[in-house]
Amino acid sequence: MRGSLQFLCDYFGITRQGYYKHVNRKMEIDILTSSIVLYCNELRKLMPKAGMRELYACCLRKFGVRMVIGRDQCYNIFRANGLCQRVRRVRPKTTNSNHNYYIYPDLLNVTPKFVADTFGSMVVADITYVATCQGWAYLSLLTDAGSRAIVGYALCKTLEAEGPLKALRMAMDFYNRYNVDLNNLIHHSDRGVQYCSNLYVGMLKKHHINISMTQCGDPLHNALAERMNNTIKNGWLFDCTDDSFEQLDKRIADAIYAYNYVRPHQGIQMRTPMEYIRKCSGKVAEVPLVGTGAPAPCREGDPRAKSFCYLMKVYSPKSCTYKRRYIILQNI
């Protein structure tokens, strides 16, 4: 027996308007679901190991008021489409504390505990290792504790102090561009021989940076730096065993750029680190960390910039300024 739509609506006690609204909403949900999957697949090219929280935060920024799907349903979409990632846990050890250098007091793990809640109040340092086809490479990272931004990095083939020194020079140049008073900055690290060496400590004292070091081998006393090692290695450098040292250096530059400008961070209300710095400093975040040494500009012909724009489905034929590049990233 066949009946008219009006008859069926009357029979079930609903209006024709309600029926069509239900049908249209289901179509909208299906279209949004497909868009979310396509968008997250593009994000995976840039952030291969990002968690579901980061993907969901990016979707909220991308779709705005059209994001009518809740968090749990969005997580189910990620699971159903293979967008969840399983992180392999590793615990590298690169600290050599068997030396005769002076170990400075710990200014972080005190009572009451020091909390770095502003940009430019504390920078944490650590070294981790990455496997390449040419052997081990050692990555030195400096992270601003308030904004979670990576402000300095260097990749070296040895564990000598030159790597941390290069990262420190980059970090000081970064802070100077944002008019951060280095006299109020605390540098916190483990008690490894690189950070206690005369060269490294001399550089810190020359710029009147306060020195803080852990007093034991507990990684929790430098937890943010250890966490940063895990984020960069398991988020971007998980499949680089076939890369050369030069290829790894480029991948690290791309990874840190994506971390600072694209990846939302739970500790700063799901903002990106450079968004947080812009909010604190009142200026547009202009200086991406690209390559080694001092931060370099984005020029036409820069393969790092072109590959990044391609991944985000944006092509800029003309030379772009930092501001325009930043806006492009915010509108993906």
List each language-model region with its residue ranges:
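Basic, flexible linker segments flanking DNA-binding modules
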Residues: 9, 16-116, 218, 272-282
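C-terminal domain-tail junction helix/linker
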Residues: 198, 205-209, 231-332
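Acidic/histidine-rich, metal-coordinating catalytic segments
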Residues: 179-197, 215, 222, 269-274
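RNase H-like polynucleotidyl transferase catalytic core
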Residues: 88-93, 186-191, 205-224, 240-245
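Mobile genetic element proteins and their domesticated derivatives, centered on retroelements
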Residues: 9, 19, 40, 55, ...
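Double-stranded DNA-binding cores of transcription factors and transposases
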Residues: 1-8, 12
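A short acidic/small-residue loop/turn micro-motif
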Residues: 144-145, 156-162
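Mobile-element integrase/transposase regions
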Residues: 68-141, 166-170, 174-177, 181-184, ...
